[in-house]
């Protein structure tokens, strides 16, 4: 039953990504992929991803999450990379940037506001990370979204 539900969820996520890709191509917009967590049996990885989703706006890092889960940073780092294909920090950054891309589609919102809403107090650093992952600046992304 859980396996069937997971397959349905993955299929829906795949369809959403396909639609995002199609829309992005039509608008010449970059697409940022964030692989869904694989069929993991590791409860710590599931819990870590859930903590990222709940606290990405805050000052969260592998140390705070490992502490919350009462496991070592080294262990969390190893299993997280194995299960997601990303380091913890890379996953967190990509998650934040996907959220930022969604927020930037509203042309009324300022880049510094988006940066703050996705957990960055330094707008320049946010912009550099955004450009590194998408190939364009947040303001250019916002302009293309119009």
Where are these regions (language model features)?
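…primarily DNA-binding HTH/wHTH and HhH modules…
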Residues: 128-146
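Short hydrophobic/aromatic patch on the recognition helix
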Residues: 76, 80, 125-126, 130
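Terminal helix-turn-helix DNA-binding modules in bacterial transcription factors
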Residues: 49-50, 54, 82-121, 143-146
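Inter-domain helical "communication" segments and dimerization helices
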Residues: 1-75, 82, 86, 143-146
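Hydrophobic alpha-helical segments
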Residues: 44-45, 97, 135
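Residues within helix-turn-helix
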Residues: 63, 74, 110-113, 123-124, ...
């Amino acid at each position: 039953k859980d396996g069937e539900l997971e397959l349905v969820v993955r299929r829906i996520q795949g369809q959403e990504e396909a639609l995002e890709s199609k829309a992005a191509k039509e608008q010449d917009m970059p697409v940022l992929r964030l692989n869904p967590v694989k069929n993991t049996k590791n409860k710590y990885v599931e819990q870590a991803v859930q903590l990222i989703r709940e606290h990405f706006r805050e000052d969260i890092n592998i140390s705070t999450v490992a502490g919350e889960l009462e496991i070592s940073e080294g262990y969390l780092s190893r299993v997280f990379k194995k299960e997601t294909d990303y380091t913890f920090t890379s996953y967190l950054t990509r998650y934040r940037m996907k959220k930022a891309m969604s927020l930037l589609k509203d042309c009324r919102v300022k880049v510094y506001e988006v940066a703050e809403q996705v957990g960055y107090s330094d707008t320049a650093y946010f912009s550099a990370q955004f450009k590194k992952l998408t190939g364009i600046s947040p303001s250019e992304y916002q302009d293309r979204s119009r």
